[in-house]
């Protein structure tokens, strides 16, 4: 399984395009999951991610922390 982890913080404007591009690229993999690891956004980032079919993990901000949380949430971590 290919797990794609996207760390975010208040990314409602850029996230739809990012998720659409990742979903298109992930279609080439046999199995995939997209995980949005959010650092406490105050906008609609998490709602947008969920509506696109991504799994959402919310935790502390910080790219490394968010990547680790996303990796821990991956189905085959």
Locations of the language-model features?
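Donor nucleotide-sugar binding loop of glycosyltransferases
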Residues: 11-14, 41, 63
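Active-site nucleotide-sugar/metal-binding loop of Leloir-type enzymes
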Residues: 51-52, 65-77
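Short, conserved SAM-binding/catalytic segment
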Residues: 25, 50-54
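A generic structural motif
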Residues: 27-32
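Short, acidic/glycine-rich phosphate-metal binding loop used to engage nucleotide
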Residues: 56-65
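Short, well-formed alpha-helical segments that are part of the catalytic scaffolds
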Residues: 11-26
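Cell-envelope/extracellular polymer assembly enzymes that use nucleotide-activated donors
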Residues: 1-3, 33
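A conserved acidic beta->alpha catalytic loop
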Residues: 38-46
């Amino acid at each position: 399984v290919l797990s794609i982890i996207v760390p975010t913080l208040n990314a409602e404007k850029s996230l739809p395009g990012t998720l659409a591009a990742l979903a298109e690229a992930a279609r080439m993999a046999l199995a995939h999951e997209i995980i949005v690891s959010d650092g406490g956004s105050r906008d609609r980032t998490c709602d947008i991610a969920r509506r696109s079919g991504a799994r959402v993990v919310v935790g502390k901000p910080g790219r490394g922390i968010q990547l680790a949380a996303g990796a821990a949430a991956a189905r085959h971590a």
